Amino acid sequence: MLWSIMSKPLDLNQLAQNIKQWGLELGFQQVGITDTDLRASEPALQAWLDKQYHGEMAWMARHGMMRARPHELLPGTLRVISVRMNYLPANAAFASTLKDPTLGYVSRYALGRDYHKLLRSRLKKLGEQIQQYCGSLNFRPFVDSAPILERPLAEKAGLGWTGKHSLILNREAGSFFFLGELLIDLPLPVDQPVEEGCGKCVACMTICPTGAIVEPYTVDARRCISYLTIELEGAIPEAFRPLIGNRIYGCDDCQLICPWNRYSQLTDEADFSPRKALHNPDLLELFSWSEAQFLKVTEGSAIRRIGHLRWLRNVAVALGNAPWSNAVITALESRKGEHPLLDEHIEWAIAQQIEKRNACIIEVQLPKKQRLVRVIEKGLVRDA
C-alpha cells in the first residue's frame, strides 16, 4: 500500500511494521492499529449513561458520543495506534495484604508512579518518530485523560477482547496493563480483532464484593469500589462500607479472580515499582498522616488526585472494618472535628468497632474475600 506525503511515496505496510517495532523499543508490550469507526459502541455507551451508571462522573455524560468519535478530537484523524504496557510489580503481595485487615490495600496499578505522564511521553516520542520518518504528520497522544473509548479501540486493534468485567483481556498477558492511544492522519493498514475468550465464565461477576458488574460487560460505577474510593467526592453509601473491607484506593478483585491473569506478565518499568510507604501499609500509620505527609508520599502518584480528605475518609472506613482494638478507636477519635465528611465516616467506624468489642467479635473475612485469597494462594492468579 503506497501513500504520498509532500510527493514522497510511503509504503504504509512497511511503516505499520516499523511503528510496531518502534513501540516495542519504547517499552510498550503490544501495538495495534485500527480505524476510527466506533459507531457500534455508541448504543451501549448511551444506554450506560441513560441508566446513570456513571454516577457523579459528570464529564462522561458531558462528552457524550464524542467518546466514540476520535476524529472529533483531532480533525483529519484516519487511524488510532493503540498500545498496552504492563504494570504488575514483582512484589504485588495481593493475598497477604487482602487477608490482613490491619493493612490497607491499594490497587496495584497505583503503587508506583502515575502512569499518565509516562505513557503519554512514550506515545509522543512514537508520534515524533513517525513524523520524522514521514516528513509530515498530525498526531495526538491520549492516556485515559480525554473523552475517548480506549477499550473498544484496543479491542478493534487486536490487543485483546473485552471481558465481562469490561476490561481488556489478552491471552498472553491477562489484564494488568495500561492502555494508550495515538491519533494520526495516515491511512495505515489496520489489525484484526482477536477471538473472545471468556466463554461461560462469570468469575468476575460473582466475586465482586458490591455486585457492581450488573450484567456481562456492564459495570454500575456507583457500586464499584474503585469508583467509591477514587471518583466519589462525598460520603460513601453506608451499605457499601462493610463490603469495602481494607481496600483504601481502588479494587482488583475482578482481575485477581480471572483465570486469564495466571498469564499476567510483570512490568519492566522501574517507575511502577511499589513505593515503600504504600506497600502493605499499616492502616493506623496511614490515618496519622498530615496533609503534608500525604502530599509528600503521593508526589507523582495517581493517589494524590483524591486529596488528603478523601484519603482519610477511605482509611476511616477500613479502620471500621478492622478487628476491634483500643488503638483504632483512639486513632479515630483523634481526628474528629477536622471536616464533616470525615466525621461521618469516623462515627460509623467507631460504631463498628464498639459493636465488635461488645460482641467480642474476632475479625471474620467475608466469604468472597476468603475465596479470592484461596484462589490467589493456589496460584491460579500470579501473586507476584
UniProtKB/Swiss-Prot annotation:
Top EC category: oxidoreductase
GO molecular function annotations of the record: 4 iron, 4 sulfur cluster binding; epoxyqueuosine reductase activity; metal ion binding
GO cellular component terms given for this protein: cytoplasm
Compartment(s) where it occurs, according to its Swiss-Prot or TrEMBL record: Cytoplasm
The 4Fe-4S ferredoxin-type domain, residue ranges: 186-218
Active site feature: 144
Pfam families with a match to the protein in the record: Fer4_16, QueG_DUF1730
Pathway: tRNA modification; tRNA-queuosine biosynthesis
UniProt GO BP: queuosine biosynthetic process; tRNA modification
Record's cofactor remark: Binds 2 [4Fe-4S] clusters per monomer.
Origin: domain of life: Bacteria
Sequence positions that bind [4Fe-4S] cluster 1: 198, 201, 204, 258
Keywords: 4Fe-4S, Cytoplasm, Iron, Iron-sulfur, Metal-binding, Oxidoreductase, Queuosine biosynthesis, tRNA processing
Keyword Iron tagged: yes
Recorded catalytic activity of this chain's protein: epoxyqueuosine(34) in tRNA + AH2 = queuosine(34) in tRNA + A + H2O
Coiled coil: none
Principal subcellular localization: cytoplasm
Xref: InterPro entries: 4Fe4S_Fe-S-bd (IPR017896), 4Fe4S_Fe_S_CS (IPR017900), QueG (IPR004453), QueG_DUF1730 (IPR013542)
EC number(s) recorded for this UniProt protein: 1.17.99.6
Function: Catalyzes the conversion of epoxyqueuosine (oQ) to queuosine (Q), which is a hypermodified base found in the wobble positions of tRNA(Asp), tRNA(Asn), tRNA(His) and tRNA(Tyr).
Subunit structure: Monomer.
Protein family (similarity comment): Belongs to the QueG family.
Record protein name field: Epoxyqueuosine reductase
Organism per entry: Salmonella typhimurium (strain LT2 / SGSC1412 / ATCC 700720)
Lineage, opening ranks: Bacteria, Pseudomonadati, Pseudomonadota, Gammaproteobacteria, Enterobacterales
